[in-house]
A protein has these predicted regions:
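Bacterial signal peptide processing site
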Residues: 19-21
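C-terminal motif of bacterial Sec signal peptides marking the signal peptidase cleavage site
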Residues: 15-17
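N-terminal, post-signal-peptide region of Sec/Tat-exported proteins
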Residues: 58-94
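Early extracytoplasmic/domain-onset interaction patches
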Residues: 26-73, 158
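Juxtacatalytic substrate-recognition/specificity segment
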Residues: 227-356
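Positively charged n-region of N-terminal signal peptides that target proteins for export
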Residues: 1-4
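Non-catalytic architectural context of zinc metalloproteases
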Residues: 82-89, 93-275, 293-296
Length: 634
């Protein structure tokens, strides 16, 4: 009913716009930019030199100058992306097709003079995928899942990379037309208002409606040779769109894994229904120079874009999708239903950030970890191992830094370097609050119930005041929760996790623990050398049983892995692949040991290291066991 109503209202607006003639001398108000949708278009049938032409038609301005911007920062990345860098041939045209004077203020902003005569803006957009040199967050290029792809078979349209906003029209509605070959499959959760075919039938133009610029940035699109599957999770329709350039992986096979996981998530969440549709966009990258290298995902309120290597085996891809998508799907709780004014009124040029990344990312990551044991997808020992991994990783960060201070200043050093800790210590903060609430309520309340209560109070259209959240949580829960937040989240005191584990009858011990082939219990066993641009093993390799048994020594330099040469530009892709190795796989690794080539050709065996292990106390009391049961299965 709401969709129909919006479509009807929008159609009425369009009729008004279409019946008015837009000229510089028009004195009526029905063509003013402030009352009309900004009409935008992308034409994928007219790509030239790997650039998509974009047209922006804003309506009539009454001011002499206007400023148009593409985002410097987009939500969810917590880093500078500068999407204006990828714009070429920027032109502002008057009603006669003549160019108006423009001034580029910075990488992302243009001021247009004589704006009362502005008819439209045109420019071309380069994509980001094929110029990436490294992956990850904080580099010269945007993190891959927030980036763009322009390829004859696939278009990743993170729309913040193509469409911008006027300073004076941030809350204006948008109309978007995307023209593409008729043979393309197209998916987006953005409200579609119509489809029109070209006269010769070779192209289709899909029209979309966005209530404001936020909805443009929050609704990515996939176009091209896609494999699409749909399934239902409660009242939520899940749309899975997969691009596998060599058809190695299918949406049907991935759907089976996603459906099982997301049904479990929905069971865990219960009555949280904050969106009728959720989209998963999976781009599987080839192993070549022009492929994206930043593997991971970027959440949107009702979708996620995932980038992973196409070469991953089925089992490894399934494991990665469970870990990545489970985290992103839980964002329908926060920030979709619970968020601050900084999120709700996000400034894409000079953003301010909430103090509460521990909640947005940390609690979300905690849910993505806890629900798997709650729903029987992993064993309790596997869950404990994941928690220990987060503790070990967080110990390598600045454990005495105020988490709220770090969150609020996440774009600048020394805080930016600590960003990864939101997924480690942030999740552990969520765990501690959960255990405290279970203890205080005799097992009846936990952090999920708190988030549901906050969601009911606020919801997606009502932001909370950032400075008041901790006080509010304290009043909604228990004094012990408020004291914890003030001491360990606002304050600089490191958390003693043993205090919390003891409440549920667990303890940390030293023993032989399983590890993978690039880490010892969460600690990387390589020491990358940027001066020599090589990746040697560190001293830690001596404590990794697989490599030690195969004669690898500290200082041995990785040269080739399964025939692929390792360099700084290929390192993330190759080492990510090594992280996914499983016992039984045949491998061939070539090392350089002081100029001598060392070849290791063998079958992987399980690797072990000496490390910390979280396990159940043999003398745990009935009270501790009951609290543990409520925590893990509540």
């Amino acid at each position: 009913m709401k969709k129909h109503l919006l479509t009807t209202v929008f159609a009425g607006i369009l009729l008004v716009g279409c019946n008015s003639t837009k000229t510089a001398s028009t004195k009526s108000t029905n063509d003013l930019a402030v009352v009309n949708p900004i009409e935008t278009s992308l034409d994928l049938t007219k790509v030239t030199n790997d650039k998509v032409p974009v047209t922006i038609n804003p309506g009539r301005f009454t001011t002499e100058t206007v400023t148009y911007r593409l985002p410097r920062v987009v939500q969810g990345t917590y880093s500078v992306s500068d999407f204006g860098k990828y714009v070429d041939d920027f032109k502002a045209l008057d009603y006669n097709g003549n160019e108006l004077s423009t001034e580029k203020l910075d990488a992302n902003s243009w001021t247009i003079s004589n704006a009362v005569n502005l008819d439209k803006i045109t420019y071309n957009v380069n994509d980001t995928f094929d110029i990436e040199t490294t992956g990850g967050i904080g580099g010269e290029q945007p993190f891959s899942p927030s980036g763009t792809n322009i390829d004859e078979d696939n278009y990743v349209l993170n729309l913040h990379g193509f469409i911008g906003y006027f300073d004076s029209l941030k809350n204006s509605q948008y109309k978007l037309d995307v023209t593409a070959p008729a043979t393309f499959v197209r998916t987006s959760a953005l409200q579609e208002t119509g489809v029109k075919s070209s006269e010769d039938g070779t192209a289709l133009t899909s029209s979309y409606f966005a209530p404001r610029y936020f909805d443009i940035t929050d609704n990515p699109m996939f176009y091209g040779k896609l494999d699409v599957e749909e399934f239902q999770v409660g009242d939520i329709k899940i749309v899975l769109s997969v691009y596998s350039p060599n058809n190695i992986h299918s949406a049907e096979k991935i759907k089976a894994v996603m459906e099982k996981m997301m049904q479990a998530q929905k069971t865990y969440l219960g009555d949280v229904n904050s969106t009728p549709r959720y989209d998963i966009y999976l781009y599987l990258a080839e192993q070549n120079e022009t492929a994206p290298k930043g593997f991971g995902a970027l959440e949107h309120h009702t979708s996620t874009v995932v980038v992973l290597p196409e070469a991953m085996p089925d089992e490894a891809l399934a494991e990665s999708m469970v870990d990545v998508v489970s985290h992103e799907f839980f964002h329908i709780v926060t920030p979709l239903s619970v968020h601050s004014e900084d999120v709700h009124y996000f400034d894409y040029d000079q953003p301010t950030f909430s103090k509460h990344l521990w909640m947005y990312e940390g609690v979300t990551e905690y849910f993505a970890t806890l629900f798997q044991v709650d729903q029987g997808l992993v064993s309790e020992d596997e869950f404990y191992a994941k928690i220990m991994g987060k503790i070990k990783t967080s110990e390598g960060m600045n454990d005495a830094m105020s988490f709220t201070e770090m969150s609020e200043n996440i774009l600048v050093e020394p805080y930016a370097a600590q960003y990864v800790n939101v997924y480690q210590k942030g999740a552990l903060i969520g765990m501690c609050i959960d255990i405290l609430m279970r203890e205080e309520s005799n097992g009846n309340r936990g952090i999920l119930s708190l988030m549901k209560e906050l969601s009911l109070k606020y919801g997606k259209n009502k932001p909370f005041e950032d400075d008041n959240l901790i006080t509010e949580i304290t009043s909604m829960t228990y004094p012990s929760v408020g004291e914890f937040l003030q001491t360990y989240v606002v304050g600089t005191t490191p958390i003693d996790y043993n205090t919390f584990f003891d409440k549920v009858g667990l303890e940390i011990t030293e023993s032989q623990v399983k590890t993978n082939y690039i880490q010892n219990n969460g600690v990387l066993i390589f020491a990358p050398n940027r001066e020599t641009m090589t990746i040697p093993f560190s001293d830690a390799v001596k404590d990794n049983s697989f490599w030690a048994e195969n004669g690898v020594l500290p200082g041995d330099v990785l040269k080739y892995v399964d025939g692929k040469e390792l360099s700084m530009s290929t390192a993330q892709e190759i080492i990510t692949g090594m992280y996914m190795w499983q016992p039984g796989k045949e491998i061939e690794v070539k090392l350089d040991r002081e100029g001598k080539e060392i070849v290791i050709k063998t079958t992987l065996t399980q690797s072990f290291t000496t490390g910390s292990k979280l396990q159940e106390k043999t003398n745990a009391t009935d009270v501790q066991k009951a609290l543990r049961e409520a925590w893990l299965k509540g």
